[in-house]
Amino acid sequence: MSGRAQRQHPGRLTKRAEFLAVQRGLKLRGRLFLLELLARGDDDPPRVGITVTKKVGNAVERNRIRRRLREAVRVHAADDMATGTDYVIVGRREILDAPFGALKDELSRRIRGNKPARTG
């Protein structure tokens, strides 16, 4: 095993009810995406859900936006996520034209700057 610290891989939000629950939390609007977050109040790994509405474009464009967001979370932002927190990222069309470096920096900056306070 190497000397590097173990990365905590975020889980996934899969059910509609989980996505709807996060809507009650903090909303951070930006040019590239909307970030919603909600503290669950436990010490489990963070969970992430990514969604792109049909208003954004056709299926090919929506899938490309999802892939870019997933990779930005995997490569850069996962280390900044707080345990016991659910995150929903709503992608916008501008992600298609944004440089990947700008996307991952913006995502990391928003997550790092807004770790929610514990509730409960």
Swiss-Prot record:
EC number(s) reported in the record: 3.1.26.5
Q: Which reaction does it catalyse?
A: Endonucleolytic cleavage of RNA, removing 5'-extranucleotides from tRNA precursor
Q: Which PROSITE patterns match?
A: RIBONUCLEASE_P
**GO CC annotations on file:** ribonuclease P complex
The UniProt entry, under SUPFAM superfamilies, shows:
Ribosomal protein S5 domain 2-like (SSF54211)
BP terms from Gene Ontology: tRNA 5'-leader removal
List the Gene3D superfamilies hit by this protein, alphabetically: 3.30.230.10
* GO molecular function terms attached to this record: 3'-tRNA processing endoribonuclease activity; ribonuclease P activity; tRNA binding
The answer to whether UniProt assigns keyword Hydrolase to this entry is yes
UniProt KW keywords: Endonuclease, Hydrolase, Nuclease, RNA-binding, tRNA processing
Q: Could you tell me what this protein does?
A: RNaseP catalyzes the removal of the 5'-leader sequence from pre-tRNA to produce the mature 5'-terminus. It can also cleave other RNA substrates such as 4.5S RNA. The protein component plays an auxiliary but essential role in vivo by binding to the 5'-leader sequence and broadening the substrate specificity of the ribozyme.
Q: How does it assemble?
A: Consists of a catalytic RNA component (M1 or rnpB) and a protein subunit.
Give the family per the record. Belongs to the RnpA family.
Q: What is this protein called?
A: Ribonuclease P protein component
The organism encoding this protein is Chelativorans sp. (strain BNC1)
